[in-house]
Amino acid sequence: MRIRLDLAYDGTDFHGWAKQGTSDLRTVQKVLEDNLSMVLRETVELTVAGRTDAGVHAAGQVAHFDIPAHALEQRSIDGDPSKLVRRLGRLLPDDIRVHGVRFAEPGFDARFSAMRRHYVYRITTHPAGALPTRRHDTAQWPKPVELERMQLAADALLGLHDFVAFCKAKPHATTVRELQKFAWKDVSTDIEPQVYEAHVVADAFCWSMVRSLVGSCMAVGEGRRGSGFTAELLDASERSPMVPVAPAKGLSLVGVDYPSADKLQERALETRAVREFPDASASLKLDDE
C-alpha cells in the first residue's frame, strides 16, 4: 500500500533532501527513512515532490512510500497511518515535522503526479541583515534594489522555455520548464525594512533554477545588469556564468499542487513520458526537481 506524507523542515543543518549513497551525511530523506523504518519495522524508501538542495527549507513538502499492510497492524498504529504523526513527533529532531500521514489515493505519485511546485524566496538588502528570528530563512543581498526592475526581469521569463542558462547540468534531464508565476513583493515592516519576497511557480524546477532566477533578477534590480538581461539568457545553449545564484537559505518550498483524484495516474504517466520542446530537434526526458 502507498502512504502519503505532508511535511516541513528547516534545511539549515541538512545536506539537502536526498540521501547520498552509504554516506552518513545528514539529509532529510535519511533522517525520515531511518525513523519510519524503525517505527514500521520495514525498510522505507521515500519518493518526494521536490528534492531540495542543502540549506533550502520546506513548509509544504510531499512524499510517499510503499509498505506492506501488516506494517500498520502494530498496536500503536492499529491500521491508521495518521497515528504516525504522533509517533514521529516524538522521534524526529526539531528541524523536521511530519504534519500529515494518510493512505495515498490510487495512482498518486508524490513526484510525477505533481502539477506544479510553489517556492518563496525571502531576501533583505538592509545593511544590518535579517532579523535574528528570521536568520535561517532570509538571505542578505549586499546592495539596494529597485522592485520594479526586478519584476520586469521576472516577467520576461514567464511561459514555456528552455531554462538551460539557469540550471546546473544533469545527465539525461531536460531544462525545459513552464514558469507559471514569478512575482516580487515588498514585505518590509517597521522592524524589518528592505525585505522582499519572490513567489515562483512552475510545473517543475531543474537543479538550482529558482535561486538562479532570483539572483538574475536581483542583478537587474541593483543595476548591475540591464533590463533585457533575463530575456537574453533564454537564448543561451548552456548554463551561463553570468547568472548569480542566490544563497540557499532564502528559499522555501511552500506547496505542491496535484490534480483531482481521477487524474492522478494520468498526470504521472504524462510526466514520466518524453516531453518534446516545440523548437527542439530532439526529445528529452523530464527530470523534476
Swiss-Prot record:
Active site location: 53
Keyword tRNA processing listed: yes
Pfam family, one: PseudoU_synth_1
Enzyme Commission code(s) on record: 5.4.99.12
GO biological process: tRNA pseudouridine synthesis
Database matches in Gene3D superfamilies: Pseudouridine synthase I, catalytic domain, C-terminal subdomain, Pseudouridine synthase I, catalytic domain, N-terminal subdomain
Listed InterPro entries: PsdUridine_synth_cat_dom_sf, PsdUridine_synth_TruA, PsdUridine_synth_TruA_a/b_dom, PsdUridine_synth_TruA_C, TruA/RsuA/RluB/E/F_N
Recorded catalytic activity of this chain's protein: uridine(38/39/40) in tRNA = pseudouridine(38/39/40) in tRNA
Binding sites annotated in the UniProt record for substrate: 119
Ranges in a coiled coil: none
Broad enzyme group: isomerase
Disulfide bond keyword on record: no
Keyword entries, A-Z: Isomerase, tRNA processing
GO molecular function list: RNA binding; tRNA pseudouridine(38-40) synthase activity
Subunit annotation: Homodimer.
Family: Belongs to the tRNA pseudouridine synthase TruA family.
Stated role: Formation of pseudouridine at positions 38, 39 and 40 in the anticodon stem and loop of transfer RNAs.
Protein name stated in the entry: tRNA pseudouridine synthase A
Organism listed in the record: Corynebacterium glutamicum (strain ATCC 13032 / DSM 20300 / JCM 1318 / BCRC 11384 / CCUG 27702 / LMG 3730 / NBRC 12168 / NCIMB 10025 / NRRL B-2784 / 534)
Gene label: truA
